[in-house]
Amino acid sequence: MKIAIAQINCTVGDMPGNAAKILDAVKQAKQAGAGLIITPELALSGYPPADLLLREAFCQSCSDALTGLVKAVDGITLIVGHPGFQDGKLFNAASVIQNGKIIQTYYKRILNKTAFFDESYYFDTGSEPCILELAGIKFGIYICADFWLGDLSIEANRRDFDIVLVLSASAYHINKQVSRYQITHRFIQHSGISVIHANLVGGQDELVFDGASFVMNRQGELTHQLGEFVEAIELIEIRNKQPVKGKLTTPQSSMASIYQALCLGVKDYVRKNGFPGALLGLSGGVDSALTLAIAVDALGADNVKTVMMPSQYTANISLDDAHEMAELLGVKHYECSITALFEQYLLKIETDFQILPDSTGSSAMPENLQARIRGTLLMALSNQSGSIVLTTGNKSEIAVGYCTLYGDMAGGFAVLKDVSKTMVYQLCEYRNQMSRVIPERIIRRAPSAELRPDQ
């Protein structure tokens, strides 16, 4: 038989859209001769649904979408992840749909408790394993943490599974795939059972799911590896109750994976929240340069605008480098001096509050004031156009508080909030290896905030 993995990008709360995407995957799988197709965890509702699960209308919409899937699926078996309801309880569920009926439903038994989604707050815990027999093959069905956190090898052996199917919404972090391989290897070593993983792909708020679904046979050999950060429908051929070796997508370098994760995070945050585009302050520095490169790669040059807002402390080379980069990427670039506004603010403060400018340069007020003027202008443009402001601060700056509240922190999405300053430089070098979009001087030049003389 043939099994299809539906590595799809679902949107939280868009049950009709998610159902349509699942049905499209089902159609492709049927045309390719698959007898079974599996989706990621909670594919029907999107992941993580969080407090939407507390809304009756949301839960009803999930149930309606599931009913629609049941009616539409024919000639193939579908295992779909969804919120499940039984006896007044809510579960993280996977239902087996076959010939217009739900023939089995599995309820997740190990619930995630993470900073971004505490499943135990919303879901009840399942108690029973699920066994699906299809085409003479005995499948065990698990959902994400059941496999990653549970010791299932004894149960799998006792149940005499041939293949374990894992529906996952496993979020990306550096070297995450290595960890997945290790856990799967360990399970196979103890059980001798093949494993098929179907993982979610896409950005959802601050999370990025990398996909990278894979299959390992009972010898612990990787037989299929789907791509990272892309949707895919992949067929796995099963012979003698084992997956036959198929397509192995070449793994990307660490920098390539990180860069693609950042691009997908930006793309889906903008797309799924309905923003027409993005804008950012381009300073001529390395952080805003990398943010711009990511934004353009994610959204396209026509959907990104940049604003250079120099003061009397801005060096000419900053103006030149910002202009050059905007030209290299083909984005609409504005230049708006804040010098007059800055001086008017200082005069107003001096006149009304009898606060004299600090000649020693020890006060942060004039520096923060410049950042806040820039933030105000960017937010005004955002309100006018509907485009989201991308902030450009990196993880190192945020961690030590080297940033300005209501200034460079003003915006809707912090692209580099989990990227250290050292990694910023590495990512700039990586991006320029593909094509030169960041002027070399931006990367090589010593960093400066340019908020006071000779800084």
Residue ranges and their predicted role:
Residues 269-276, 296-306, 314, 324-336, ...:
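Secondary-structure transition/capping motifs at alpha-helix termini
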Residues 108-112, 117-129, 136, 158, ...:
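Active-site adenylate/phosphate-handling loop in enzymes that bind or generate adenylated species
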Residues 50-54, 242-243, 324, 349-361, ...:
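Short glycine/proline- and charge-enriched loop/turn segments
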Residues 259, 263-267, 283, 292, ...:
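Generic hydrophobic alpha-helical scaffold/packing signal
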Residues 230-237, 303-308, 316-365, 371, ...:
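A conserved beta-strand->alpha-helix junction
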Residues 1-281, 292-303, 308, 328, ...:
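Enzyme catalytic cores with a strong preference for nitrogen-chemistry domains
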